[in-house]
């Protein structure tokens, strides 16, 4: 990138966000090579801590509720996903397939991380030919909705913007630093799945017959809007942000009081990111059963913004499951409720767990103050009670 363009990116980003957090005195980020050399050891340490226990699943008290996820027919074909996965695998070289395919019950499912430093398995987009990339995108398009596909691509593009804002550091950040693995063999009847893993974008996609589980999934970005550069104008997670705030503001004063865990937000609040598969997290916030029907529908619409990243027909199956448990759902909030506030919200039921969080600067600390701001968002979707990665379905198969 030319120096003039790079300079305009840094200035524009600082002006755009100065009303959220006063910029620190600009400093130089540490040389990329110094950090990259530590990545393998950092990854091994994260895995050693995060995978020390066998998978159980996220629970409210350490025990999973049984019978929530029966093996059944949904009537929604997964054939397009299977065909796309076969085409992707066929496009790879023999050596690429060896490092991309794992057994369906492999620990590889749980080896994902949002951070850019994590050393990932599989075949990376950066190492793919154009034909292989198209096959990979074909798998994503078959699995995701148009909304989910656009969000995924925009997150990848904003990772390029992040590289631009770090003095063209495309060793750590970039559009193509995302990896795909396939677990099992694509099948119409046997369990299998695939995973997309990279900075601010993780999709775990399990298939059994015509059932699909697309959790854990992670959607985020820093920045959330490209003020300039190659992908100027790209924006993500605004709908999830605005709809969350609108729902909170729809609550009565008493309901807001119940929903609010804390009014201030000095730091990061997400709890269910990488290597938190067995987190014990009790319900908190306002019980949805106490809300009006119109409020319940508004909350279901907010949930739909996340669920509908899944292909539309499968998303409807998931929404029905979530709706059936609406009276067992809780909504919690941290932070302010003004138009410019930073905040965290959590939607938690026996069958879905969603977190949205405005985070502190992580990869732009050389530009912004060390407080949460709207240009760094993390959102995580989980299936509690043992069915992340489709584990409960796999257990029953």
Label the model's feature ranges.
Residues 8-18:
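Bacterial N-terminal signal peptides
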Residues 24-90, 99-145, 149-397:
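A cross-kingdom marker for long, charged
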Residues 1-9:
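Bacterial N-terminal signal peptides that target proteins for export
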Residues 19-23:
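Sec/Tat signal peptide C-region and signal peptidase I cleavage site
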């Amino acid at each position: 990138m030319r120096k003039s363009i790079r300079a305009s990116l840094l200035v524009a980003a600082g002006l755009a966000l100065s009303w959220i957090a006063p910029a620190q005195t600009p400093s130089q980020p540490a040389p990329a090579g110094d950090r990259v050399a530590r990545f393998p050891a950092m990854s091994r340490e994260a895995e050693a801590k995060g995978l020390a226990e066998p998978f159980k699943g996220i629970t409210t008290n350490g025990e999973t509720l049984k019978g929530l996820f029966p093996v059944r027919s949904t009537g929604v074909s997964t054939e397009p996903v299977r065909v796309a996965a076969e085409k992707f695998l066929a496009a790879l070289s023999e050596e690429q397939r060896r490092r991309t395919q794992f057994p369906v019950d492999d620990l590889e499912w749980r080896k994902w991380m949002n951070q850019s430093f994590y050393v990932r398995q599989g075949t990376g987009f950066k190492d793919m030919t154009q034909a292989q990339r198209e096959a990979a995108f074909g798998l994503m398009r078959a699995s995701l909705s148009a909304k989910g596909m656009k969000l995924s691509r925009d997150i990848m593009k904003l990772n390029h913007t992040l590289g631009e804002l770090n003095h063209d550091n495309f060793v750590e950040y970039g559009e193509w630093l995302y990896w795909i693995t396939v677990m099992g063999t694509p099948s119409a009847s046997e369990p299998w799945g695939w995973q997309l893993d990279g900075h601010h974008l993780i999709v775990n996609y399990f298939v059994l017959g015509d059932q699909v589980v697309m959790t854990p999934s992670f959607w985020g970005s820093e920045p959330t809007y490209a003020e300039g550069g190659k992908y100027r104008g790209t924006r993500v997670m605004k709908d999830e942000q605005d709809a969350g705030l609108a729902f909170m503001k729809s609550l009565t004063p008493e309901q807001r009081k119940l929903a609010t865990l804390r009014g201030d937000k000095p730091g990061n609040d997400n709890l269910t990111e990488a290597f938190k598969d067995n987190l014990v997290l009790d319900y908190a916030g306002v019980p949805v059963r106490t809300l009006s029907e119109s409020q319940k529908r508004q909350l279901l619409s907010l949930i739909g913004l996340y669920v509908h990243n899944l292909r539309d027909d499968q998303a409807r199956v998931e929404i029905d499951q979530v709706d059936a448990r609406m009276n067992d759902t809780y909504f919690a909030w941290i932070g302010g409720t003004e138009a410019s506030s930073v905040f965290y919200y959590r939607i938690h039921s026996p069958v879905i767990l969603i977190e949205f969080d405005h985070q502190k600067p992580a990869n732009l600390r050389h530009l912004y103050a060390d407080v949460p701001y709207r240009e760094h968002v993390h959102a995580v979707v989980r299936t509690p009670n043992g069915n992340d990665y489709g584990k409960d379905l796999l257990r029953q198969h």
